[in-house]
Regions:
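Short amphipathic alpha-helical segments and helix-helix/interface helices
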Residues: 13-15, 45, 67-76, 91
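Conserved "right-hand" nucleotidyltransferase catalytic core of DNA-directed polymerases
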Residues: 1-59, 121, 133, 146-312
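Nucleic-acid-processing active sites and adjacent nucleic-acid-binding tracks
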Residues: 50-82
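A short acidic, often aromatic-flanked loop/helix-cap motif at beta-alpha or helix-coil junctions
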Residues: 12-13, 63-65, 113-115, 253
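Metal-dependent phosphoesterase core characteristic of DEDDh/y 3'-5' exonuclease domains
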Residues: 44, 49-51, 87-155, 177-178
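Acidic beta-strand-to-loop metal/phosphate-binding motif
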Residues: 24, 79-87
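Short, well-ordered loop/turn elements at secondary-structure boundaries
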Residues: 18-20, 42, 75-79, 102
């Protein structure tokens, strides 16, 4: 339509000028962002809405030098206000794929605006929020049959994908106008939003390049916590007299504490701590059980999981 343009050539890209405007920005990518290594999928559409028209940069030129130059100008020009919906995903992805400065980020995130105003809302996705506040239609309905089982937006016919991407920025822009006015009249929510934007900018700078991880130090920490766990496990088995006592077994823990004359309704941390407070005589066993659990959590949740992510 007259307010919807597909940008298919480098010349058309170079002709775009958004100086002095507020624009909404969104991307679509190939692959499955939930399972694929981060930013390995190509950007197959970039959409910009400037308050009067949507410009959808097609897959042929979305990752071109001209596209990179336009994105750099959008994000660096202080006379252009860039709005996203969950820019913590889009902006680092653009930065990584197009080779931009990691300190570039959007000016406003309408999703964080919504979260700051309505943090107890059950849904913060663009489409349901647009339907609630703007009476928007189900504009993604047609694409769902192509994306079953994962992302893979490359499966969507291009013209349909571009329409979907254009609708995303149109509604992001309209919601931005609505929430911006609401925040102007709500100082408390505005302060929360401004703080969240600071956190978002920090995360965006980190994501394209990651953070350094000292694998030698991680190995040292793992050895330390393994030793702590083994020492606590030895105490558990000494106190209970059971060489195969398993502190992760609720049944065994209940029976062991009962053998000391104390009944507990569950083996949750809070219950065990309360039982220990009420019955100091079980402290050696409870302390050891909790120490085993704590060391296991550090090893499994933090050390091992962090090491697994190195290089992704």
């Amino acid at each position: 339509g007259e307010n919807y343009f597909i940008v298919r050539t480098k010349e058309e890209l170079e002709s775009l000028d958004f100086h002095g405007k507020t624009v909404a920005l969104d991307i679509e990518v190939s692959g499955n962002i939930k399972t694929d290594p981060w930013a390995t999928g190509e950007i197959i559409a970039i959409s910009i809405y400037d308050g009067s028209a949507a410009y959808v940069i097609s897959s042929e030129v979305a990752e071109s030098h001209e596209s990179a130059a336009l994105m750099r100008k959008l994000l660096a020009d202080d006379k252009i206000t860039v709005v996203t919906w969950n820019g913590t995903f889009d902006i680092p992805y653009i930065v990584r794929r197009l080779g931009l400065d990691t300190k570039l980020h959007e000016d406003h995130d309408a999703m964080l605006m919504h979260y700051s105003l309505y943090n107890t809302a059950g849904e913060h996705g663009l489409e349901p929020v647009a339907q609630r506040f703007l009476g928007a239609p189900d504009w993604s309905g047609e694409i769902k049959k192509y994306t079953k089982g994962g992302g893979h937006y490359e499966r969507i016919p291009r013209d349909l994908l571009y329409y979907y991407n254009g609708a995303d920025v149109y509604y992001s822009y309209q919601l931005y106008l609505l929430f911006h006015e609401a925040l102007e009249n709500d100082p408390r929510s505005r302060a929360i939003y401004e703080q969240r934007m600071i956190y978002s900018a920090m995360l965006q700078e980190i994501q394209p390049n990651g953070i350094p991880v000292d694998l030698n130090k991680m190995s040292e920490l793992r050895a330390k916590y393994e030793a702590d766990r083994e020492a606590a496990l030895a105490v558990c088995r000494e106190v209970t007299g059971l060489p195969k006592f398993n502190p992760n077994s609720p049944k065994q823990v209940k029976e062991a504490i009962a053998s000391l004359g104390v009944e507990v309704p569950s083996t949750s941390e809070d219950i065990l701590k309360q039982a220990r407070y009420d019955n100091p005589e079980i402290s050696p066993l409870v302390d050891a059980i909790l120490a085993v659990r704590a060391a296991t959590k550090v090893i499994d949740s933090y050390i091992d999981n962090t090491v697994k992510l190195v290089g992704e």
